[in-house]
């Protein structure tokens, strides 16, 4: 019985040191702000656009390590002449030392009137959805 206790103690000690040796990677990265604008410089916060504008999505992050991924998924939710919830495009980037990132979506033709959205993912998790209109 005493031999079993010693073996269990040795196994627990080995497990404890193994767990301590493993590096825990917990990110505190978060999106502090996200908004849409037709302005390339990122100024303004818009929810209504005209059909000839480029959509800029500005995303501000905090505590993001250099390997954090951000993804913007653009969708036509309820738009004239297209199926509901039509996927338009997506863009993904990996953060470096910056804390502000801009995604954009443009069209060679006029954007059809209707409801759109852009979903912002951080490290594969949906963090924010911005809805907007084209009139």
Language-model region placement:
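C-terminal motif of bacterial Sec signal peptides marking the signal peptidase cleavage site
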Residues: 18-21
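Bacterial N-terminal signal peptides that target proteins for export
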Residues: 2-9
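Contiguous segments within soluble domain cores/interaction surfaces
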Residues: 23-115, 119-131
